[in-house]
Amino acid sequence: MSLLTEVETYVLSIVPSGPLKAEIAQRLEDVFAGKNTDLEALMEWLKTRPILSPLTKGILGFVFTLTVPSERGLQRRRFVQNALNGNGDPNNMDRAVKLYKKLKREITFHGAKEVALSYSTGALASCMGLIYNRMGTVTTEVAFGLVCATCEQIADSQHRSHRQMATITNPLIRHENRMVLASTTAKAMEQMAGSSEQAAEAMEVASQARQMVQAMRTIGTHPNSSTGLRDNLLENLQAYQNRMGVQMQRFK
């Protein structure tokens, strides 16, 4: 895997799924391919994106700044600086300085990532802030190692919370989670169906599922009533794809 592919993989792992994720992936591809060279416009676009946490925006802003060539005097952006200040905790800043000194001795992406992984997310963010604010310099490879270590830690904690969701026994939360998943699956089906005639059937199934979820939420239903809702949808989608000759096993 090339360095930029690895960076893209780690960064996208912390962006919530949805249309915005696809948009960010495209922006990253363009930046890494040297197609997008207007850093100021890129940062303005990033600043106004909804849904993303300040830290995710800060990391993306850091990656864009590392990659897009810009004039030396280009102003640093406040929203990135605020996100990468380690919550203003002096302990994070102390650890960030120690980490920075170690990173100065590293020359490879993987070496930097290994060193960084033993620090907390707050210290890693602060260290990125040091580099972003030009208070320290490291090679681009080392900076990318720091980025990927931070993303790995964030993705780990997100994964833990997803696992917790899977093991929650509260029937009301599980019921709502099934309905949310059915709704997002239906939306994805509608987007994938396109405008072909064969797609009408898939659109119909998706539309019915969304109406059903809406009705269940409006009138209030027994927590078990949503069992199998998403699985039925996925079976329908799979059957539709097989007829269309499309294989998207990974969708599940």
Swiss-Prot record:
Q: Does the keyword Membrane apply?
A: yes
Q: Give the InterPro entries listed for this entry.
A: Flu_matrix_M1, Flu_matrix_M1_C, Flu_matrix_M1_N, Flu_matrix_M1_N_sub1, Flu_matrix_M1_N_sub2, INFV_M1
- RNP-binding: annotated segments: 165-252
Q: What coarse category fits the chief subcellular location reported for this protein?
A: virion
List the SMART domains.
Answer: Flu_M1_C
One Pfam family per UniProt? Flu_M1
Name its GO BP terms in alphabetical order: viral budding from plasma membrane
**Is the keyword RNA-binding in the record?**
yes
- Which cellular components does GO assign to this protein? host cell nucleus; membrane; virion membrane
Q: Where is this motif: Nuclear localization signal?
A: 101-105
Family statement drawn from the similarity comment of this UniProt entry: Belongs to the influenza viruses Matrix protein M1 family.
Additional facts recorded: Most abundant protein in virion. When expressed alone can form virus-like particles in transfected cells.
Q: What protein does this entry describe?
A: Matrix protein 1
Q: What is the lineage of its organism?
A: Viruses, Riboviria, Orthornavirae, Negarnaviricota, Polyploviricotina
Originating gene: M
